[in-house]
């Protein structure tokens, strides 16, 4: 699940991100987006390159790829991850990285056939500015492709323990995460559910031929939780076993929740509920009683620059 971690953290670069895409689904998208004709692609907010590394083999054989991130550390590691993933002649000279801010890219207008991002806009205080920059550097008739989640719903996904919860607890939980999300936005930390807004933003920015897809990957958990994907999904849960606050950073949650209009009393009640839920989940996992279908809403939205 793509929880609303601080974008500066590295929680979202855990192993689970390696299972984000089914290979045959990527091949289908590559076909829909006609990536075989694409000779230049820019990945904005590339992080360690998880997204563009997957798209790279589908591009035209001589295509060049530019990964951009504002953090130097990520682009250095992204370069390494391309080197590790592809034999040198494949990527040599074709893949480059640049440190730049998504809202003020140091790139000429009308440069790339495709400009894309995965979970970048959700971290921007002004996501529309980021989108406009992506469009600016796209060639006329080129495509903009954004992959962004709807994390409020992902946080509320049900599992085998949900039927034990009373309705009031679930309603409170929704209010809690809604206030958390709104507080994040108010503090300029980005909208963790921005996926829902992308089609409208694309239309407002003047893109045409807008198409919207949903990622087809789910992260199911069921006993005995044995395969590598399930282990990767559970890995953070194991790491959180030793933490007093479970998976949650109390100070961060507090900041966002209060900024979203929540009260200090509700914060403490809700935080204990979260801790209890986390402990119940761990107990159920160890007893083989926990299961979840593991769906998460992640939109892929593409549009063409006129
Ligand atoms: C959640 S990570 C996603 C990384 C990568 N796209 C992926 O899917 O694995 C968000 C990335 O956006 C970068 N980022 C956040 N704000 C940015 C900005 N204003 N300009 C450029 N990069 C930014 C972060 O440094 C981070 O690498």
Residue positions per predicted region:
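A short acidic, Gly/Pro-enriched loop at the edge of an enzyme's catalytic core
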Residues: 103-115
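A short SAM/SAH-binding and catalytic strip from SAM-dependent methyltransferases
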Residues: 113-128
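A short glycine-rich, Lys/Arg-flanked "PGG" loop and its adjoining helix->strand segment in the class I
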Residues: 128-143
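Conserved alpha-helix/loop element of class I SAM-dependent methyltransferases that forms part
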Residues: 19-39, 54
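C-terminal helical/coil "lid" or tail adjacent to the Rossmann-like core of SAM-dependent
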Residues: 2-12, 213-293
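Acidic carboxylate diad motif detector
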Residues: 146-148
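Class I SAM-dependent methyltransferase SAM/SAH-binding core
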Residues: 40-44, 48-104
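Conserved catalytic/acceptor-binding region of the Class I
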Residues: 150-247
């Amino acid at each position: 699940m793509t929880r609303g971690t601080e974008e500066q953290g590295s929680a979202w670069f855990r192993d689970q991100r390696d299972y984000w895409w089914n290979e045959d689904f990527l091949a289908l998208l590559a076909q829909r987006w006609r990536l075989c004709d694409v000779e230049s692609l820019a990945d904005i907010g590339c992080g360690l390159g998880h997204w563009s590394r997957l798209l790279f083999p589908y591009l035209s054989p001589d295509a060049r790829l530019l990964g951009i991130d504002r953090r130097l550390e990520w682009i250095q590691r992204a370069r390494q991850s391309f080197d590790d993933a592809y034999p040198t002649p494949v990527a040599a000279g074709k893949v480059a990285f640049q440190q730049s801010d998504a809202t003020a890219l140091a790139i000429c207008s009308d440069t790339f056939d495709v400009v894309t991002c995965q979970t970048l806009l959700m971290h921007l205080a002004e996501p529309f500015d980021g989108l406009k920059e992506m469009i600016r550097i796209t060639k006329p008739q080129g495509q903009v492709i954004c992959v962004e989640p709807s994390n409020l719903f992902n946080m509320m996904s049900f599992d085998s323990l949900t039927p034990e919860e009373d309705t009031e607890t679930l309603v409170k939980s929704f209010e809690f995460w809604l206030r958390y999300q709104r507080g994040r936005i108010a503090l300029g930390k980005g909208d963790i559910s921005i996926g829902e807004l992308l089609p409208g933003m694309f239309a407002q920015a003047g893109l045409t031929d807008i198409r919207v897809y949903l990622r087809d990957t789910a992260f199911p958990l069921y006993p005995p939780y044995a395969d590598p994907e399930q282990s990767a999904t559970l890995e953070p849960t194991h790491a959180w076993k030793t933490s007093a606050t479970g998976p949650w950073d109390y100070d961060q949650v507090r900041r966002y929740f209060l900024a979203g209009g929540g009260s200090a009393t509700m914060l403490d009640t809700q935080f204990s509920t979260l801790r209890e839920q986390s402990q119940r989940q761990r107990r159920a996992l160890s007893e083989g009683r926990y299961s979840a279908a593991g769906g998460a809403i992640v939109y892929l939205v593409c549009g063409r620059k006129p």
